[in-house]
Structures are given as C-alpha cells and as structure tokens.
C-alpha cells in the first residue's frame, strides 16, 4: 500500500489527496535541494524518482553539428540533467529505507549510451545523460556498502507526448509515442520489477537493459 507521497517541483501545488505533500525545489541550487530533503528527513523513503530534464528552450535546441557547440547551452543542460540529479542523490539517498527494498530512479535516455550512438549530434544532451548514467552506476556501487536493500536505476522512458518532445515527434511512429500516463505505467512496472542485479543499469520502458 502507498503511504505518504512527497512531490517536488519548481512551484508548490495543491493536491486533492491528503497523503500528497508538494514542496518547491530548484534543481540548479544545491541549497534548495538540501532544504527539500530536510523537509522530509523524519520519514523513511521507499521510492525516489527524479524526472528533471532539459533538451531545448526558446533560446537553444539540440546541436546538429560542432558549429552549434556553445558554453552556455552545455552549462544549462548539464546543470539540469546531470548536476541537479546527482545532488538530489546526495541528499535523498540517506533517507532511503535500509530494512526493505528501496529504489532511486533517474529519468535518463537511450541516447546517453555510447555504444548505441550511430547518428551523432545532440552533443550536450547526449553527454549529459551519459554522465548521469555513470553517476547512477557510482551510486549503485556505494549503496552496496551503505544500504544493501537500495537499488539505483537510470530509466529510458521512450518518447512521451509533451512540450519536451513536441519538435521531434513527427519522426516517431504512433505506436512509439506514449501518453504521459502510459509511460508512467510502463516505468512503474520496470521500477517495481527491478532487482539488485540491475542496480546501476540503464533500463528501457520495456525492461531491456541498455548497454553503456
């Protein structure tokens, strides 16, 4: 059964259920992340899911060639896709259940796989997810020493109907373009079905382990 649910976002929102509490967090601020964790430090956490991510804004899009490489773009993408999630791990992993199976899962991407990269491009996004996958692997190794019941996962959600994927969905077949609810359902099954042997891996929405 589900107990309390804590959600964190850029702006706190009201929820229908009394079991759901929402707090503000800025994934680009270490102080904000630490304060967010402090707000639930008296609770034992069974599941932590990090869904922050950036691919494009009004000011930039994924790079198509080396001529598009830009310091500000790299800094912004790494800040949200890599550094923020790493710091969330730092402050939330110590709150995870040590007596029963607990899981921390990060939304990543197949394009972060070096062996799977045959198209090139998307320099900052690809490499930010590659770095995130390495961080998740590191978390899994450390958790073997500090919390043997904890699992760290990176997740490939597929292409989900959202503002995030809007500019690119024309290249995706209809059966591979998921609604947010369906994507959540698939990823929930992967998370709940995961084992200690898969800790540190990048798992696809269908349960496939994606090679680094």
Residue ranges and their predicted role:
Residues 1-16:
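Conserved glycine-rich Rossmann-like NAD(P)H-binding loop of the short-chain dehydrogenase/reductase
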Residues 14, 115-116, 147, 156-169:
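Short beta-loop-alpha junction of Rossmann-like oxidoreductase domains
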Residues 15-32:
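Rossmann-fold cofactor-recognition segment
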Residues 49, 105, 152-155, 165:
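Hydrophobic structural elements of the Rossmann-like NAD(P)H-binding subdomain
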Residues 54-58, 62-83, 98-146, 158:
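Catalytic loop of short-chain dehydrogenase/reductase
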Residues 84-89, 187:
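Conserved internal alpha-helix within the Rossmann fold of NAD(P)-dependent oxidoreductases
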Residues 89-90, 137:
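A short, exposed helix-loop element centered on a Lys and neighboring polar residues
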Residues 154, 162, 166-212:
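C-terminal helical subdomain
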